[in-house]
Amino acid sequence: MSWIERIKSNITPTRKASIPEGVWTKCDSCGQVLYRAELERNLEVCPKCDHHMRMSARNRLHSLLDEGSLVELGSELEPKDVLKFRDSKKYKDRLASAQKETGEKDALVVMKGTLHDMPIVAAAFEFSFMGGSMGSVVGARFVRAVEQALEDNCPLICFSASGGARMQEALMSLMQMAKTSAALAKMQERGLPYISVLTDPTMGGVSASFAMLGDLNIAEPKALIGFAGPRVIEQTVREKLPPGFQRSEFLIEKGAIDMIVRRPEMRLKLASVLAKLMNLPAPNPDAPREGEVVPPVPDQEPEA
């Protein structure tokens, strides 16, 4: 045995520290490596560049409503492939895949509860479910939310994140635009506030119906909001669109929305606005609220 081989036989390789999958993630905008639990505590907002990442419907509603007050509505409603639609894949297979991936039956989750002790009904889109597309179940759940708000005589808040009407349901999905808008007319007749929160992205038939019908239309920073996408518009008009076209900041400059609110400030802002509209005492910004306990950051960051 040569002297090199003798040295090699005495070398014990160090064991690489194992980090469970999913502990770290990267910001979609700046590429910063982020601790997953800290990002969740910060409501999926990058602490470095303030990029607002997409948030699941349930996490959004749980971050909005008071702990212990949440009651889900319309969970028994499930989509059906009435048309036996098929493109590159059967619609029923797309539904099964989306339901397995997200754990949701469809793209809208509705809950009633309290916000700073004020009764409200809130709805949020699950964009991971077929791009948050609006089908008959989404329309039915939204109408259920309106009916509950009317019954409880309380405000309604909807967080939109959708690519538009669901093409696999054809005319039935387009009918939801009129159905949801007609339901909101009853809120207006009763004088109950409806606040629409536009998140990234809010497009197509959703933006052309209830997403833009709020008594107050609020957007998150840099959210893409419009009907057709920028690429489609450029190809149609054969012109270069201005920078930031269809983003929140562009829309507020043109008067299309009322305000832009950062996600960490959204809960208190909504409570303050609704308290004024409902002639109730202003919420206490220092009121304690139970939150998640975040485990300590691991010593070793993942390799780039």
Curated annotation (Swiss-Prot):
Pfam families: Carboxyl_trans (PF01039), Zn_ribbon_ACC (PF17848). Residues 295-304 have a biased composition (Pro residues). Binds 1 zinc ion per subunit. It comes from the Bacteria. GO terms for molecular function: acetyl-CoA carboxylase activity; ATP binding; carboxyl- or carbamoyltransferase activity; zinc ion binding. Residues 281-304 are annotated as: Disordered. This is Acetyl-coenzyme A carboxylase carboxyl transferase subunit beta.
